[in-house]
């Protein structure tokens, strides 16, 4: 695998997630404008994360990524706990980035998404086509970071519950 750790992989998983949720939110976030502390949905997600999967070491930081918890098996299992599947594409891309990142360090891994409220889990493995999408996502994040103004927000159903709603639409 090509080594992209020089600068491309200083991106965090939340940035990958936000790219697939909302590019405007990503732009605010990378500038340190964080509104999540105002969100009841973020609080609910933190509660689920803290109360789920007892006995697991939580929030494992490896370089620029922060994983909910890991298990050591034949490969490293990356575990992410999510509240619901409404933004499943963003969740999948986030954990694919984690796998990609760890692979660049020579660490074999796979990911497991947990949806405790739905009592579902989803196993994710990095495929060749995913690597290309991750590379494109990294380039797009770098482009969004370079913008002097936020991208024009595109209203979605999720916007009404977003912590950044007022910055975008009021």
UniProtKB/Swiss-Prot annotation:
Q: Which cofactor does it need?
A: Mg(2+); Mn(2+); Cu(2+); [4Fe-4S] cluster
Question: Could you give the cofactor binding note from the entry?
Answer: Mg(2+) or Mn(2+) required for ssDNA cleavage activity. Can also utilise Cu(2+). Binds 1 [4Fe-4S] cluster per subunit. It may be important for protein stability, since mutation of the Cys that bind the cofactor leads to a colorless, insoluble protein.
Positions in coiled-coil regions = none
Q: Which residues are the signal sequence here?
A: none
The molecular function terms of the Gene Ontology recorded here are: 4 iron, 4 sulfur cluster binding; manganese ion binding; single-stranded DNA 5'-3' DNA exonuclease activity
Q: Which reaction does it catalyse?
A: exonucleolytic cleavage in the 5'- to 3'-direction to yield nucleoside 3'-phosphates
This entry's Enzyme Commission designation comes to 3.1.12.1
What are the BP-aspect GO terms? Answer: defense response to virus; DNA catabolic process
Q: Decide whether keyword Manganese is in the record.
A: yes
UniProt xrefs under Pfam families = Cas_Cas4
Q: Which domain of life is it from?
A: Archaea
Q: Which residues bind [4Fe-4S] cluster?
A: 22, 159, 162, 168
**Keyword tags:** 4Fe-4S, Antiviral defense, Exonuclease, Hydrolase, Iron, Iron-sulfur, Manganese, Metal-binding, Nuclease
Which residues does Mn(2+) bind? Answer: 49, 68, 80
What is the stated purpose of this protein?
A: CRISPR (clustered regularly interspaced short palindromic repeat) is an adaptive immune system that provides protection against mobile genetic elements (viruses, transposable elements and conjugative plasmids). CRISPR clusters contain sequences complementary to antecedent mobile elements and target invading nucleic acids. CRISPR clusters are transcribed and processed into CRISPR RNA (crRNA). This protein may be a 5' to 3' ssDNA exonuclease.
Protein family per UniProt: Belongs to the CRISPR-associated exonuclease Cas4 family.
What protein is this chain from? CRISPR-associated exonuclease Cas4
UniProt lineage: Archaea, Methanobacteriati, Methanobacteriota, Methanomada group, Methanococci
> By which gene is this protein encoded?
cas4
